[in-house]
UniProtKB/Swiss-Prot annotation:
Keyword Repeat: no
Family in the record: Belongs to the guanylate kinase family.
Keywords: ATP-binding, Cytoplasm, Kinase, Nucleotide-binding, Transferase
Binding positions (ATP): A10, P11, S12, G13, A14, G15, K16, S17
Protein name (database record): Guanylate kinase
Listed EC numbers: 2.7.4.8
PROSITE patterns: GUANYLATE_KINASE_1, GUANYLATE_KINASE_2
Catalytic activity field: GMP + ATP = GDP + ADP
An annotated Gene Ontology molecular function: guanylate kinase activity
Originating organism: Xanthomonas euvesicatoria pv. vesicatoria (strain 85-10) (Xanthomonas campestris pv. vesicatoria)
Gene Ontology CC terms: cytosol
Length: 203
């Protein structure tokens, strides 16, 4: 049985990575695909754990070689998911989660129409602003650009299957887990997973 592909997107500062990490800790059946990026690591970020950090030239080379499942220019830097991180795992029956932006999500849905997509929203504009400022990693000019980009990102929430409002972290994580559980209980998935049982029951 082929694995399920999950897409999770959110504006910067909505708590996407924290929710994803907490959810995956509860649900080890899902593998997180580590994205490639051309930007420099931020303080505390480690290669191959948070991102695969490569130069812009290396990223372009991967584009030309057709190595990416999806890629997009995000906040002036390239981000993308390698084919090798997704296609073999799905074919082997493993569930894979992509933590990407709306541009990448749109590309993925064109290739995998049955992918399950989730968009995370902040509880308010004020909360988004406060969360972004707590990072303390950007200048005011960069902060203004990121807030504008966050608004642009949120305009695309209607393209996703599920929406989570991250007002209370534990509730948001529980809602993400519920989405994964519901996906596994879909009739098509259960029909494949329990084909022998269903056949025996209906004989």
């Amino acid at each position: 049985m082929r694995g399920t592909l999950y897409i999770v997107a959110a504006p910067s500062g909505a708590g996407k990575s924290s929710i994803v990490n907490a959810t995956l800790a509860r649900d080890p059946k899902i593998a997180l695909s580590i994205s490639f990026t051309s930007r420099a690591p931020r303080p505390g970020e480690r290669h191959a754990e948070h991102y695969h950090f490569v130069s812009a030239d290396e990223f372009q080379g991967m584009i030309e070689a057709g190595d990416f499942f999806e890629y997009a220019l995000v906040h002036g830097d390239w981000k993308g998911t390698a084919r090798q991180s997704v296609e073999p795992q799905l074919a082997a029956g493993h569930d894979v989660l992509l933590e990407i932006d709306w541009q990448g999500a749109r590309q993925v849905r064109q290739k995998v129409p049955d992918a399950v997509s989730v968009f995370i929203l902040p509880p308010s504009r004020q909360a988004l602003d406060e969360r972004m400022r707590k990072r303390g990693q950007d200048s005011e000019d960069v902060m203004a650009q990121r807030l504008a980009a966050a608004r642009e990102e949120m305009l695309h929430f209607e393209e996703f299957d599920y929406v989570i409002i991250n007002e209370t972290f534990d509730i948001a994580v529980a809602e993400m887990c519920a989405i994964f559980t519901a996906s596994r209980l879909r009739r098509q998935a259960q029909q494949q997973r329990h084909a022998g049982l269903i056949q025996a029951l209906l004989e």
